[in-house]
Curated annotation (Swiss-Prot):
Keywords: ATP-binding, Cytoplasm, Hydrolase, Nucleotide-binding, Protease, Serine protease, Stress response
Record-linked SMART domains: AAA (SM00382), LON (SM00464)
Record-given protein name: Lon protease
Listed PANTHER family: ATP DEPENDENT LON PROTEASE FAMILY MEMBER
């Protein structure tokens, strides 16, 4: 076989799941832009393209690395433009080609190739003649075994004289796998190609023979089943004549007796009886028997009328809740209110609560305690990442592998119709093409509808009105409004330092001492150690990391006791770093003296309150306002509003009225790596600017927070408790707050307000008078 090798450049059309051989004539659709551009280029020149198969058919935008190196040079015989911005082309394979380099990849692939054109073959070569005979013989045997080969293809093989064409035509009709086709396309040497083709045909022939054996075996089994069905029907008739009962009949009777005890309404009872009747009439080998059995078992296992006896002793419930959790007053109060009303009114529906707060504050664990206090069975449903509506409502019975939703599953697990069901992480559900689980929960959490909750699988209404639902969330922002409307929201703020100390003393240390195999006598610590762990090793709203650090401390103590044969280890603030390593955080520090342009603000973070030092600097310039410290858009707008307020009051404040033309103001909030935003720093930035412009110092023992308007009003802010605690932590006792936040301060615990002086202001002028020294 003579092969002429020529080099040329040619545009490429990438193919998905298709390998084209020389001498093949076929049509396919071209829709990708990269292919349409290559097609356009080819039609403008010699109407020839290189067809390269993709290694991964799923790749939408292939790169050169995603294409095979060998392909087929093809001539475009016809092109038809379709309405959907695609073109249907008819191509004829001409010759093999190997890509030796990419000339360009945009807007289409243009490659340099070595093209291999075959020119006849030496048919006098005995080895070649033998290979051709073997391939043709194997092909004819394969064609007799299968109906896949079209008759015209079989006929054309007998008339082909060119050995290369013969190999390619047979390969195109016999080989199924894309990788095998590509392997043959890459065989430039004719003898090697025929040898490999012969191996692949034999393998395909073997697969066909195995398929035939499987078909015959399955047919025999079907015949056997039909015979068995006929005999069983005869046996049924004989048993009926003799008055005997078969196994399905007795099984159906057993199901009827069990269903009768469930206390279902007559309408629902008839629905279940229909399924039992179907089971009775089915042939013993029917696949539907398993489906009906599973359904009936679900119906029987559900607690239709089973209740746990609820505790309605308000003092007992209060003691249990206090025993398990410190603080969480709002949640406990709401449960005690429910108990009080429940005692006065027997048919009270279960409340639907939503506990919202940062991680680690005890939302999930308080739910478990509530269940224990009320003597209700407890079941937790994790909703985080849920995106399929069927997870809530269940799948319809018609689907293969259908199962009930999580609500019904939880009820079967609880074994009572009045459990406490915790819907954990309700804010982390999402939706996709399978539906919106949040919408499915609307019926579940609506006390006016959930007395007849209908699961798609069970199809019988179930009364959820006696279930106590408690949902947990970290934020309300991602909960859809209609769903949020059905929830009674109880916000759980982060714990104060005092609360964390009490929790550590009462619960965390005793628990970790026990879990790490220690005795109380083997470890000594005082309150100062707990405060140091809270301040320097954890920075969170909850106590999850605090418990981790205490656990680490106990493990180190256990290790030291065993290694050094000690009877007792004393932990102090001095040796704490030995057990927990270097401090992870530093304590907020108080500004020690009155300074010009430096003001202490108060900020809220997910980890609690923080003091925020705001610095202002004035320098000659052109009125530019520079803001640094990674401030968000809201803070930047507050700074601009502050400048306008000061301009309007410049004369009263004793400031040069042209300061906005002659001076540049630079405001910086330290710890620039941390993003900061929110409107509550408005009064702080305004005070810092006035101090810097008037050259008057700001009192270092005053902290402030509040949003400002252009008219100078001070608006209320959130996170009051956390901000006051932050001021208290650094030793600041004077706090300026918006007047409308007075009610929030009144609700705070006494220990938070102790030794603190609160000044409530309505206007920014009051802030300037209090904070700036004359």
């Amino acid at each position: 076989m003579m092969i002429a090798v020529t080099k040329r450049t040619i545009p490429v059309i990438p193919l998905r799941g298709l390998v084209v051989f020389p001498y093949m004539m076929l049509h396919f659709d071209v829709g990708r832009q990269i292919s349409l551009k290559a097609l356009e280029e080819a039609m403008n020149s010699d109407q020839q393209v290189l067809l390269l198969a993709q290694k991964d058919p799923k790749q939408e935008e292939p790169s050169p690395e995603d294409l095979y190196q060998y392909g087929t040079v093809a001539k475009i015989k016809q092109m038809l433009k379709l309405p959907s911005e695609t073109s249907r082309i008819l191509v004829e394979g001409l010759s093999r080609a190997k890509v030796i380099g990419y000339v360009s990849v945009d807007p289409y692939f243009l490659v340099e190739v070595e093209e291999y054109k075959e020119k006849g073959g030496n048919l006098d070569d005995p080895e070649l003649e033998a290979l051709i005979r073997n391939v043709v013989s194997a092909f004819e045997e394969y064609a007799r075994l299968t109906s896949r080969i079209p008759p015209d293809a079989i006929l054309s093989v007998t008339t082909i004289q060119n050995p290369g064409q013969l190999a390619d035509v047979i390969a195109a009709n016999v080989i199924v796998k894309l990788e095998d086709k590509q392997l043959l396309l890459e065989q430039v040497d004719l003898k090697e190609r025929l040898t490999k083709l012969y191996e692949l045909i034999l393998r395909e022939k073997e697969i066909i023979e195995i398929e035939r054996k499987i078909t015959i075996k399955v047919k025999k089994q079907i015949d056997k089943m039909q015979k068995e069905y006929y005999l069983r029907e005869q046996l049924k008739a004989i048993q009926s004549e003799l008055g005997e009962k078969d196994s399905l009949f007795s099984e159906a009777q057993e199901y009827r007796e069990q269903v009768q005890k469930l206390g279902l309404s007559n309408e629902n009872l008839q629905k279940v009886y229909k399924e039992i009747d179907r089971l009775e009439k089915l042939p013993p080998n029917s696949p539907e028997i398993g489906v009906i059995r599973t359904y009936l078992e679900w119906i029987i296992d559900l607690p239709w009328n089973v209740k746990s006896e609820e505790k309605i002793d308000i003092n007992v419930v209060k003691n249990v809740l206090d025993e398990d959790h410190y603080g969480l007053t709002k949640v406990k109060e709401r449960i005690l209110e429910y108990i009080a009303v429940r005692k006065l009114k027997n048919n009270l529906k279960g409340p639907i609560l939503c506990l919202v707060g940062p991680p680690g504050v005890g939302k999930t664990s308080i739910a478990k305690s509530i269940a224990r206090a009320l003597n209700r069975n407890y079941v937790r449903i994790s909703l985080g990442g849920l995106r399929d509506e069927a997870e809530i409502r269940g799948h319809r019975k018609t689907y293969v592998g259908a199962m009930p939703g999580r609500i019904i599953y939880a009820l079967r697990q609880a074994k009572t119709k009045n459990p406490l069901i915790l819907l954990d992480e309700i804010d982390k559900m999402s939706q996709d093409f399978r539906g919106d689980p949040a919408s499915a929960l609307l019926e579940v959490l609506d006390s006016e509808q959930n007395y007849a909750f209908r699961d798609h699988y069970v199809e019988i209404p179930f009364d959820l009105s006696e279930v106590m639902f408690i949902a947990t969330a970290n934020t309300l922002e991602t909960i859809p409004r209609p769903l949020l409307d059905r929830l009674e929201v109880i916000e759980i703020t982060g714990y104060t330092e005092e609360e964390k100390v009490e929790i550590a003393k009462r619960y965390l240390f005793p628990k970790q001492i026990e879990q790490n195999g220690l005795k109380k006598s083997q470890i000594r610590y005082d309150e100062a150690v707990i405060r140091d762990i809270i301040s320097f090793y954890t920075r969170e709203s909850g106590v999850r990391n605090l418990e981790r650090e205490i656990a680490r401390l106990c493990r180190r103590v256990a290790k030291e006791i065993l290694e050094e044969n000690k009877k007792m280890v004393r932990i102090t603030t001095r040796n704490l770093e030995k057990y927990l390593g270097v401090r992870k955080y530093r304590r907020d520090e108080l500004i020690e003296e009155d300074r010009i342009g430096i003001v202490t603000g108060l900020a809220w973070t997910p980890f609690g309150g923080e003091t925020l030092s705001v610095e202002a600097l004035v320098m000659p310039g052109s009125g530019k306002l520079e803001l640094t410290g990674q401030l968000g858009d809201v803070m930047k707008e507050s700074a601009k509003a502050a400048v306008s307020i000061i301009r309007a009051r410049a004369k009263e404040l004793g400031i040069d009225e042209n300061f906005y033309k002659e001076y540049d103001i630079h405001i910086h909030v330290p710890e620039g790596a941390i993003p900061k935003d929110g409107p509550s720093a408005g009064v702080t930035m305004a005070t810092a600017m006035v101090s810097a412009l008037s050259k008057k110092p700001v009192r270092h023992d005053v902290a402030m927070t509040g949003e400002i308007t252009l008219s100078g009003r001070v608006l209320p802010i959130g996170g009051v408790k956390e901000k006051i605690l932050a001021a208290k932590r650094v030793g600041i006792k004077n706090v300026i707050l918006p007047y409308e936040n007075k009610k929030d301060v009144d609700e705070l615990e006494d220990y938070v307000k102790k030794d603190m002086n609160f000044v409530f202001v309505k206007a920014i002028d009051e802030v300037f008078k209090i904070a700036i020294k004359e």
